[in-house]
């Protein structure tokens, strides 16, 4: 029987001439960028999502009035929800309006000599903030908040505060701006962790611990880190959940009485996905374009070499390099013998970086010469922004849909083309994740292999009956992999008992799993869910446009409408920061003010209460389960086993775990040194 299981692992690396988040001024303006007096971040991780609040002080060190500009990379799936500017005794609060209206109001106030602020989203690349008419020696404090879902992968949760610029802008844009990324005072990140499940360890490679309080057995920690290198490096925080936690279904609701509700549903399968033991093929597709210079191509080559050296005797591999075109440097598949590995490492040492990036040609070449009788994994290392050859997302979607493949997409660096990667993965039933330049490349490759070497759940479909739900995202996915959570957002009418059903195929066998739960009539603990639901909707419709399933003009109207309704910054909406009097003058409704008040009230209440467990597939414990508690037994097979964890599993996972743990420290240290 032919086995057509082709897997692509794509590592998208953005590495050249790395810049940092910071203040900007035009190079030829004669003005220096605003001085960063302090930069303080508070991250609250609670029940599957993170709230990030950034407070930064700017000072105009010029002798004339200036427009202060600050930019930072767009975090993955982030909903920028609030921004406040304080200049002396004057406070300006943000309201989301259509982008053209925000620009008009901002320019009007700026030209009148008044203070005003505006926050914009520039595609997938960055958020930018402008403050008009900052007087000489004046200090402004800007505070903004964003929310994002934070899924767990194989028992490990990862949070990233992006600071490094990804260098995806053109050279002219980079040369236009002078940048300041060094605070004169301290830069700190405070992480408040509130997990409903026991935690065994936390780690932040880039931060120096300034203060720490932790009760990991009960899932809580409060740690402040100092960023000693300023705003030049991403801040990455990891925490590991306890081993032997159960597979589970968690549903976090939000519903005002008399209105439709919103929910975030997180499925952590406890299904026993067995290891694949047959010999496999691996194709490494390495970007050697000019953006991979500065020692990065050599670092990645070493990572690939380490991966090859851990292969089984019956595995084969193939190496392709590409810039404006592709070259098969191994001349096809070769067995993973010691001699062949040594030859391949020597070839990789000779690769130099130059030229442009043709991602489409790299993928096209990678899909050639596939053996239907063997599991094939394609590991693609690229700088993320294709600038030569085919660049239309529809063409990528069409090519991927013609092949029965799996794409594992890992985007390293910030300002990466998340929409294109989502399209490639959604069409092919793949998996994608972020890798910071201050993260671990080798560890990510190893973690991907734990998914590649295990069975997957195919054609996953989730349905909810008993309560009317609508606008549900991710309820149908082609594949779900070992250790991967399925995170869905949706809306519901009324309230009451419901049955959640998941249908899937595992090794050709049809499986059906069910779970009963209750949607509440009223639950106002998590109003932030509405903003994250809106971002999930935008991403879903963006993918439909990229696949040719929705018209771009129709999508533009949709994005503008949902951005205004839920008060989030999008490509079609902006935050305009004005005083109360200015808002009234421009007839701007205070919709965001109401949302922010509700969110802050809920956040204050949550701080005084024990961490709430939202598990619905079993009686909810009143406190986090001890780390050594066995998984509860259910008649429902989805929850018969423990959830996969990085520290246990079948097949070759134990070997790969050792490599991951060793690599996480070594690679992070090397990046910092470079």
Predicted stretch roles:
Residues 418, 423-468, 475, 482:
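C-terminal helix of von Willebrand factor
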Residues 320-347, 364, 368, 387-394, ...:
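Short beta-strand-loop
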Residues 170, 269, 277-334, 340-375, 411-417, ...:
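Von Willebrand factor
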Residues 382-428, 433, 440-446, 503-505, ...:
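VWA/integrin I-like adhesion module and closely mimicked acidic/polar interface patches used
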Residues 654-673:
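A cross-kingdom C-terminal cell-surface attachment/processing module
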Residues 4-6, 18-47:
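N-terminal, polar/Ser/Thr-rich
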